[in-house]
Structures are given as structure tokens and as C-alpha cells.
Amino acid sequence: VDFYKHSHIDFNGLEIENHQFALPIKDGPEMKALELELRRLICSSEKLRRMGSTHLYRPSADFNALFLVAHAVGHFLYESIRLRSVLDWAFFIKKEHASVDWEKFCAWCDRINYSKFVMCMNYICEHQLGMKLPASVKRNDEMGAYLPMRILDDMFKDDALYTKGYGGLMFRIHLVGRYFKNLWKFQEVYERNAFYL
């Protein structure tokens, strides 16, 4: 395979992204470990669920919980997330909460420093969207509203620095600008140095 991120496949006029990896494994050993866990979960046939009478299968709720959060964190740290990410999480919890092994999920979140982000997402779901979180879903009301509200505020800002359509030097300038704009996310939410890999 000669691509890192994904290739494209044309299937009956529909463009499909074919990802070699679920996560950016170049981001360090934790991402590689989580990638292996996601592969284990997706290959765990006893938890795959058939979609109707088709030969298509949905991955387990454990896979989806970890992947949804990892995907949202990646966009949050390096770009920005929109309300859609919170709604994806809220609807996932509403439908799948009983199928998730929350103890294992929380252990992974602690290991890869996603716990604070998840607590913020849960806080937004509960306190801003009015969702009643199931007892099995971890929350941390002692954290307060500051950080979840800062994340929510960031979602609605129009100053997101997107690099689509830029090439060469302009791409690099915007990439560096976006990186410095998002330093607070590494320090306050991810609790890692932005230069950590």
C-alpha cells in the first residue's frame, strides 16, 4: 500500500474513502496502541452486528465509542469541531450506552488523555442539550462549566483556519497559524505539550 491516510475507490459512481488506518498512527505510541485495539474490536466477530438482511456489518459499540471520540479529538486539537460531533456523541450514547463496556472505554480515555474531552462532551450533552445521561456514562460535575463552554464557544466561531484549497507556502502559513490558535486545546483539554509525539 503506497498511501498513509486513504485512497479513493469508485464504486458505481460513488467515491469511497479506503482508509489504511482508523487513526493517525504517526502521532505516537498511544495512537498505535489504540489503532491495534480498534482493529481487535472490529475483528471481534461475536460483537459485529448485521445490518438488516444485508451482508453488511456494523462494528461493536465499544469500537464506535472509542473511534467517535478519537476522531472528534483529532479534529478538535488540530482544526475545530462543530456541533455535529457533540450530536454524534449524544445520539450514540442514547442508542448504544447499554452495549458499551464503559470501564474499558474510560481506561483507554485515561491512557490516551481523552478523559477531560469526554467529560466536556458529556457536560455539553447534559447541561446545554438537556440530555439525561444514563448512570453508566461517566460525568465530572466538579470540573465546572468553564472548559466545556470554551469548547462550545470554539465550535461556533467563524475564524477556523481551514487549509482546503491552499497549496505550497500558503498551506504552511495557515497550518502554523491554526496550530498556534489551538495551543490552548493541548494545554487545557489534552493536557499534553503540543509538541508531544
Where are these regions (language model features)?
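Conserved NTP-donor binding/palm subdomain of two-metal-ion nucleotidyltransferases/polymerases, i.e.
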Residues: 1-197
